[in-house]
Amino acid sequence: MAQGSDNNDTSYTKSPSPGNKQGSSDDMRKVMRREKNRIAAQKSRMRQTQKADSLHLESESLEKENAALRKEVKRLTEEAKYLSTVLSNHEPLCTGLSGASPELLYGAHHGAFHQHISVPHYPL
């Protein structure tokens, strides 16, 4: 890039003639406007960086929560399979109750063929 072609370079601005108060006032306004714009741009970049940092932290938190929920789904799926197996193994022992209502099948029954089965507790 050629030297002096930068629009923000103030060394190439025209200096007003000593008697021209209007030109001096315009230059001051231009300098003030540029300074305000520079500060506003800096604040905008800071807000953008803070927002990106915040979104990054939220993303990490959601990924951890997602992993915990997937772990819980896996545990509950394994528990459901286990309980299904326990039920399948227990149903043949309840031969006198075939065709009975669900309350009798799955309620507390104390028949001669009832087998007590301990259910494992999975850690969270």
Curated annotation (Swiss-Prot):
CDD domains: bZIP_BATF (cd14701)
Compartments, as annotated in UniProt: Nucleus; Cytoplasm
Stretches with biased composition (Polar residues): 1-23
Subcellular location, principal: nucleus
An individual GO BP term: isotype switching
Family: Belongs to the bZIP family.
Region described as Disordered: spans on this chain: 1-60
Protein's name in the database: Basic leucine zipper transcriptional factor ATF-like
Domain of life, per lineage: Eukaryota
Its biological purpose: AP-1 family transcription factor that controls the differentiation of lineage-specific cells in the immune system: specifically mediates the differentiation of T-helper 17 cells (Th17), follicular T-helper cells (TfH), CD8(+) dendritic cells and class-switch recombination (CSR) in B-cells.
Gene that encodes the chain: batf
Span list, region Leucine-zipper: 55-83
Entry's Gene Ontology cellular component terms: cytoplasm; nucleus
